[in-house]
A protein has these predicted regions:
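Chalcogenol-based redox active-site neighborhoods
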Residues: 1-170
Length: 170
């Protein structure tokens, strides 16, 4: 059983290998981050969803937010996915089951011909410069995901107005 990361909680620092070499680090202090967890190379809706990031490049830059994409895929699968989608953001791979559970993600077993490993269902986390979860969205299916353009508008509002982390009462 997974437990959700509460809004306002410290985001666990996760370090994953990155497509193209090096590592991608999620969590920690000092910057705004948006970590988008996708199901994997086998998911056409993930390709469409993350393919929309390119049109939002300027808005992402203006928000001063680092966007990273994460999956449980292998290096080869993640590299192929990033190339097929034309991703211009860091892509971390090799998310393991313990990390998926730590993030409170739903985990699915593959159907025939999907992939060769269990994988996370979609999740999106906005981490503030204090290293805390500002916004969290976790889904159990590929069909329900937040609109990134609207989310970027919300982040700009949060930054400009000092809007508090919501969902922390009770």
């Amino acid at each position: 059983v997974n437990s959700k990361i509460p809004a306002g909680a410290r985001f666990p620092e996760i370090d994953l290998p990155k497509v193209g070499g090096g590592n991608v680090k999620i969590g920690g202090d000092g910057r705004w981050q948006m970590a988008i967890v996708y199901r994997g190379k086998h998911c056409p809706l993930c390709k469409k969803y993350l393919g929309g990031l390119d049109a939002l490049k300027d808005k992402i830059r203006d928000a001063g937010i680092e966007v990273v994409a994460l999956s449980a895929d292998t290096a080869e699968q993640a590299t192929d996915f990033a190339a097929e989608v034309g991703l211009d953001v860091p892509v971390g791979y090799g998310l393991n089951e313990a990390q998926m559970k730590q993030l409170g993600l739903y985990i699915s077993s593959p159907r025939p011909n999907e992939t060769d490993h269990d994988f996370p269902e979609p999740g999106l986390f906005v981490i503030n410069p204090d290293g805390n979860v500002q916004v969290v969205d976790i889904s159990n299916a590929p069909f329900a995901r937040p609109d990134i353009d609207s989310l970027l508008n919300g982040i700009a509002f949060i930054q400009a107005k000092g809007y508090p982390i919501r969902g922390t009462a009770g």
